[in-house]
Amino acid sequence: MSLRECIINGGDETNPDGTPKLSREQRDEALRTFDEYKSQLSLKLPEPEADIEAGRMTFTALEKKVRDRNRRKIMQLRAQKQALLDIQSFRNIGGNEDLPLAAQALFAKDERAKFADAETLQTVYLRKATRKLDKMLGSMRRNILGGIRKKAQMENVVREMMGTDTGDVAAREMGEALASVFEDQRLAFNRMGGSIGKLEGGYFPVTHDMMAVRSVSKDEWIQFMMGTERAGGRDVSAPTKEARPGLIDVENMIDNETGLPFTPQKLEIALSNMYDAITSNNATRSKPGGFGGNGSLASQRADHRFIKWKNADAFLEYNNQFGGKELFDVAIGHIHSMSRDLALLERFGPNPATTKRYLQQYLDREAGLRKDEKFADEVSKANAKIDTFYEYNTGANLAPISSRWGNVFAGIRDLLQSGQLGSAFLSAFGDLATQNVARASAGIPQIGTLTKILRNVSPIQATKKGELAVRLGLVADGWSQMASAQARFTGEMVSPEVTRRISDFVMRASLLSSWTQAGRWAFGQEFLGFLADNVGRSFDELPDNLRRTMQHYQIGSDKWDIMRATELYDYNGAKFLRAEDIANRTDLPPTVARSIETDLIRMIETETNFAVPSSSMRGAAMLRGSSRPGSIGGELLNSFAMYKQFPVTLMNTHLMRGVAREGRLSKMVYLSHLMLAMTAMGALSYQMKEMAKGRQPMEMFSEDGEPNMKFWGRAALQGGGLGLYGDFLFSDLNVYGRGLADQTAGPVVGLLSDVKNLTVGNVAEFAAGDDTNFGKEVVGMASRYFPGNNIWYTRLAFERLVRDNAIRYVDPKANARFRRLRRKYLKEYGQEYWWGPGEEAPRDRPRLQNIIGER
């Protein structure tokens, strides 16, 4: 009896309890697997032998599937058990158990939690990957226009990865490093329950432009892939078209389900399914309640790697026609995507969505058992936040409801940033305060902070300094991503490339990008160097603050002994304790080495975010909730959230750390240190911004030494990231002429209001016989929103020589308005202009003695 007959009979036979020995699903799966093997083997073996071999291979394949399912079940149970242990160990600010807060901390970073969260783990896996790409990132890093350097060499990198010898030694080395990163991530994915096969002949990820693929029919797309000669010799090309070869290596493409080469018919079915998935944005692969497809994250991604290109030229031809175009971005995007999935797998097991629901059900059950209305309300809110955080973890909330309107509004936000954040660099001096507080908290020496930052900002040997930072596993977003610097003020956003390039140019030209990256590099290098300086000390001998910081990340004496026994990394005489060197130790069990590596990266990355506050998932969720782009509600929330990310992040980091410290004295010391440092740096930023606007510095103290409370109120808000709101302390309008309601609604709403006033408002005024001031309003809008108009070192010249003259041309009362504005600041704030509105040249120079009340 053949195995096929046994399978059919197994569906008819029953167990003693009356259930079938094989369920319908099991029988159908076994029959499908057998038939696929049989059809492939029949092409090269006689019927009896093909039947026997197909039976053997079917049995082996089904056995492997059972093993894989059981392995994933065990890993899933283990992840769920660990999640429960972690949330039960969590203590809130009062030192009490708090299950609702604890469960949220598994998804988004919470200063009170000592365990790892999915948000931080994503960054950990990203740092593990990019540290091998120092040469590639240094060579290909983005220029001031946001473009990739050496695009042609990136094509050589791809050719080398796919087996073509280009003769470009640097490209070969970069290709080997990138291939190693892809392989490391594949193996890590498989360790956590996945089953991604290794593609022989080299692998480079392919992305698909949905709109480009939609522009051709399914038949045309499959023909483009397979060539005009298709399954069974069927030629589907039009009679007038010349025959053309396909791009994929049909003979050597392996069916992941069978492990054998595809039959032409099966390959065509696979490509048909692939076309449907691309053009439907994966909707054809989705099932209700699943994670981006079939529910189990670990069982995904294997189908992405069955395409085997004939050669690198074939891949590049597809990429130019239907792919993501920019090869560097495709590679970095793949690393980011894999890092996201690896974080979810490590924290929540092979099926993260199931673990999420398990935790929510656990909270619901606890609420039912405790019969406490307040606790039940907290659980309800926590479960809603968990859903929101999970959408951020998976990136589901970035998909616009309407891609057309989502892109339109994202582009508008980019352009607004390019026209309004040109002087944000002057606000970034607050980083010196947060660096100071973060270093003190971790026990790191605070001497020379500014010098180290400026050394990294300097363009001298910029590539070498950056490559060192990457090798140390530090952030390199400014090299690999566009629009990374403004994310600390606006949050992460997806937008059209053209507007993103404009915004990115302003951030780089204004020095905000280099300042932000330099600050993060300086802190990370100092921390790793400080650890290296202390390897001669036992855990108990470490400085108190450093020891407490390490304990917060679950690094105790046992882990520290392993870390300090690791050979230090030497760079021109400077010693560093690198996570990579711990992971590469062959004398440690791999699981132990990887665990300590993760703890060290998690500590460095989290503390760096305290030193240079950046956007956070928790902050984005607080401001935007679970809204998605492309909808009215989502776009209104995106407008509201703009420029508010920094103060919210500050609240979720430093303020939360301060109130979470043990003992009232410790809380007071930390928070007072933070407040004084931020206010001092806020004062510096405010005075710099005033001088950049052409005004003399504002008096900080009167002649008799009394503090100017108007100034210090503004300085405190400036230091806390609320500089725009400082204007509302003493007036109804801010410096942009907006009221509190308009400012709170956000820049997009403000722009729409300006457009309405310029159009509908002027029409109404004209109809009523009133003066319209149309020309003045046009000039005002153009100067307010023109990209790069307020870059801090050019804004004053632009305003005086271009804007003011344009206003004079369209407004006969311009000079009178300019005089009123100068008198207003002198009367209300005691400030004169050193280069005032309407003046052709500076009348004075900034008088720094004004700061202390001297005239």
Question: Can you describe what each PLM-predicted range is?
Answer:
Residues 420, 427, 431-438, 634, ...:
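Short hydrophobic helices that act as membrane-entry/anchoring signals
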